[in-house]
Amino acid sequence: MSKPLKFLLWSSLALLLLQIGSGAICEGKSSEPAVRQTQVKWREGKKFRVEVMNKCPMCPIINLRLKCQGFPQSLVDPTFLRVLSSSAGNCVVNDGLPLSPMQTLSFNYSNTHQFALRPLSWSFQCE
């Protein structure tokens, strides 16, 4: 293989690795965090299981905020979901600490109805 061709291949590989290292791999809908809720208990009131997942396979996610309109802090341990403003519907997951790539954080709450929880904002911590 000629030297110019080797140089071109290595340069292309280096640029690709730089692109991956800058967090570009965690862009787009497929890497957005996901929130899934399921009802897990029917008797003696309703109980809901919430799973929050970092869907990026390469980078931790930090400072994940959820839209949580009307959610009372008393329903869940604040280390899992901290209500910053119930009226504004702003909550932070895991105290803003990182969720590892593909990690799922789960918690339960009991209430007469299910609250709408959805990702509001987040950052990827790619190096």
UniProtKB/Swiss-Prot annotation:
Q: Which domain of life is it from?
A: Eukaryota
Q: Which organism is it from?
A: Arabidopsis thaliana
Give start-end of the signal peptide. 1-23
**UniProt-recorded name of the protein:** Uncharacterized protein At1g05835
Q: Mind telling me which PANTHER family this protein's record contains?
A: EXPANSIN-LIKE EG45 DOMAIN-CONTAINING PROTEIN (PTHR33184:SF36), PROTEIN TAPETUM DETERMINANT 1-LIKE-RELATED (PTHR33184)
Keyword annotations: Signal
InterPro entries to which the protein is assigned, alphabetical: TPD1
